[in-house]
Structures are given as C-alpha cells and as structure tokens.
Amino acid sequence: MESEVSSDIFIKRQQFDYKESHSLVFTLDAKLDDGEALTKVYTDFIDYKCSSSDEDMPAPSEDIQKDYEPQNSFFGKDTANRFPKPKVANENIHHVHVFDGSRSWSIWEAKEQFYRVCDTLLFYSSFLKSNTRYFHVLDFLYNPVGDNKSHQKMKDDIYMQALADRAELYRKSL
C-alpha cells in the first residue's frame, strides 16, 4: 500500500505494507524544498530502504557495510549521528552519503558501501512504533565540491539540535 498526504510536519508520506515484516513509512520534513533533485534522492532512498532486510534497519551494521555493496548504488556509508548528546542519539538521527559526481562513478561503484564517502549527505531519523518502521528525511546537503562543508555541519550543535527537534516533533505527532 502506498499513500501520500501532507501536514505541517511533513510534505510527503509513502507507506509500504509487508505481510512478513514491518510496514515502512517514509516522510519528507516540511522545512525541505521539495525540488527535482531531492525528489530523485528521496525516491532512491525509499528503494534503498525497502530493499534492505529487517536486520539492516535503520542502517546496515558497519561490518555489513565493509563487506558488501549497498542495495542501491547511489548510496554510500550509512551511519548514526551521536552528537550532541543525548538528544541526537535519542532521536536516532542518521546520515547516508549520496553519490554526487565528486568522484568518478567507476571508483564509487567499485567500493563496498562503508567506503563510499563524499560530502553530499541525506539526514534522516528512524524509529519503530507498533510494528511500523518510520523514516523521516530531515535534510539533504548537496555539496559536490567536496570541501567538507556538509560534514562540518555535523559538528554544529545548533544545526544538529534543530534536526533532533524536528525528528522529535515528527515522532510525537504519530
């Protein structure tokens, strides 16, 4: 089952129901500009997570990522953010690296998931509630220049706190 609705908290919602595992719900934060680039990344993100196993939710373990390629070639390292504590960790904020052309496709594609890194990042929160796994896309930082500005944002406590606040607002709205 797939559905799309809007609210003051999110601008898109898609739900996929599976008989033998969790239902998956994907949303885009209402503060995001729903342009063409984000729509493509959001669609690919849904495909990536829908093709992952339940054990790999919300993200594959570091060991799995070091040994295998991702389910969707456009995505690289997928990892939890831990700072500032405790809110970012409590809201289960993650980021995944997204292919941006700053490296050649042949080099990107030849690497296992953990080693596919760049400075274009998709931030999301994830949680499980009533046998449904929720993924809320919080931000997309497109930076093909590769000057590390997106990664520097993760060191900005105010920015990360704002992501955690939006994740908490979404989680509490359900």
Model-predicted regions and their roles:
Residues M1-C118, K129-L174:
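Basic, Lys/Arg-enriched alpha-helical interface segments
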Residues S126:
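Conserved beta-strand/loop element in small beta-rich adapter and peptidoglycan-binding domains
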Residues L122-F123:
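Hydrophobic/aromatic beta-strand elements that line small-molecule binding cavities or substrate pockets
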